[in-house]
Amino acid sequence: MTTQTTNIRDDIRKADDVFEKNFSQGNAAGIAELYTNDGMLLPTGSDFVKGKEAIRDFWQGAINMGIKEAKLDIVEVEVQGNVVVEVGHYQLKGAGGDVLDQGKYIVIWKQEGGQWKLHRDIWNTSRTA
């Protein structure tokens, strides 16, 4: 791993930490601010969720459904030109620490305003139906 990749991985980990903190505080607006202005979610069973307002509303809905904590574990970070691809595992917990879902994700990160921000965010569960 190059020094540049190591530094970018650290930047992505810090951004993931902020995502997790905002989630645990029920701060959907704070989560949405971590995305680019034209950011997009690609959730299972749903159409594209485009833009910060829609992203905020999506995460607020998840919080309202009882998800209290999101844990993100990076598996790999790969620099590809002017974007970064993060692959990892996630775990969503409810009140009392009950695991509500777990799975894997890919995020394409893009710099905006000098900061790495989530640009495309896709995930799917590892749980069987």
What is each PLM-predicted segment?
Residues 2-33, 40-129:
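A beta-strand edge to alpha-helix "cap/lid" segment located at domain peripheries
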